[in-house]
Amino acid sequence: MAHSFDIAFVGSGNLASHLAKNLEKAGHRILGVSSRRMERAQELAKQLGADTLAVDDPKQLPEAEIYVLAIADDALPNLWQTWTPPNKRALVVHTSGSVSLDSIQSLSERTGVLYPLQTFSANRPLDFSEIPCFVEGSDEEVTQTLLELAKSVSHEVNPLDSERRRTLHL
């Protein structure tokens, strides 16, 4: 792996859990997990290790290089109206197949999408390396960062714009 990233997650559901665990296994540091349900954040943080902070408000997340917004599509608009990352140069990434990249551009100068093409279940083990992942970045540097991040957990990673991703998601 070329670079190890410091990452914080907003969301603790099935996708967040699988992605966070696999990113950590790949050598990245998961600094914090935020969830509306504190017990879910604590459960995931415990699985990720002693240094992972669990909070119930994303405003309490520690400063990170990358913030992954792994929450329900319908919860995203409320989040981007009420939250900004503590690190203004942070890369803010959502994981939705149906939400455009433009929708989060007010959160940071550096935004992107990391979309794993998979339905995630809590108790079903997955080989994340076999899951196709699609990325889109606000600029070429962000796209390259997301390609590197996604390739650390998946063997099948490709760039894909919002319109084609939405079609694929449906």
Q: What is each residue range found by the language model?
A:
Residues S17, Q42, P77-N78, D102, ...:
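Alpha-helical elements of the RecA-like P-loop NTPase motor core of helicases
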Residues M38, L48, T52-P125:
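Rossmann-like NAD(P)(H) cofactor-binding subdomain of soluble oxidoreductases
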Residues H28-R29, E109, H155:
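Short phosphate-binding/catalytic loops that engage adenosine nucleotides
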Residues A8-F9, L69, V135:
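Hydrophobic Val/Ile/Leu positions in short beta-strands of Rossmann-like dinucleotide-binding domains
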Residues M1-D56:
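NAD(P)+-binding Rossmann beta1-loop-alpha1 motif at the extreme N-terminus of oxidoreductases
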Residues R40-Q47, P125-H169:
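Internal alpha-helical scaffold of NAD(P)-dependent oxidoreductase catalytic cores
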Residues N14, E39-R40, D74-A75, V99, ...:
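Short alpha-helical
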Residues H3-D6, R89, E130:
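Phosphate-coordination loops involved in phosphoryl transfer and adenosine-cofactor binding
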